Amino acid sequence: MSSLTHLTSHGEAVMVDVSDKAETERVAIAEARVVMRMETLELALSGNAEKGDVVATARIAGIMAAKKTHELIPLCHPLLLTKVGVDLEPDPSLPGFRVQALAKVKGQTGVEMEALTAVSVACLTLYDMLKAVDRFMRIEGIGLLEKQGGKSGSWKREKE
């Protein structure tokens, strides 16, 4: 098992020094689900939710969150993101939304935290905008699906 990169040999927290690492294109994709009642999903898709366009607002919130990841997660490097995308797919079989976020950068460190932050905040925004009608919603399965680039190369989660 690898050692923890954000701790010194004395257990003190540090931001990892990436100055000697090569700049490479890096991509990360994260996913999550928001499970809700079917009536809540229908309301979200109708565009008639009291707080407005639920899907568009959650998408923008996720993108904004990715850009602020370094302000939210201690020791995260600020990155010049080259792309952030958030997709919210309605899934009646849940019922709810399947949410995916993609983050890209040409840099010296990965974008996993940015993709995870984007998907998390998009889900939290769905929850916030719909909680008045459905207090039983659940956010589930937040995780990294895939990463590409950097010294460790590509990684993809196997189907469960």
Swiss-Prot record:
Its EC number is 4.6.1.17. One of its GO terms (biological process) is Mo-molybdopterin cofactor biosynthetic process. This is Cyclic pyranopterin monophosphate synthase. Homohexamer; trimer of dimers. Substrate binds at residues 75-77, 113-114. Keywords: Lyase, Molybdenum cofactor biosynthesis. Pathway: Cofactor biosynthesis; molybdopterin biosynthesis. It catalyses: (8S)-3',8-cyclo-7,8-dihydroguanosine 5'-triphosphate = cyclic pyranopterin phosphate + diphosphate. The active site is at 128. CDD domains: MoaC_PE. Pfam families: MoaC. It comes from the Bacteria. GO terms for molecular function: cyclic pyranopterin monophosphate synthase activity. NCBIfam families: moaC, PRK09364.1. Belongs to the MoaC family. The lineage of its organism: Bacteria, Pseudomonadati, Pseudomonadota, Alphaproteobacteria, Hyphomicrobiales. Catalyzes the conversion of (8S)-3',8-cyclo-7,8-dihydroguanosine 5'-triphosphate to cyclic pyranopterin monophosphate (cPMP).
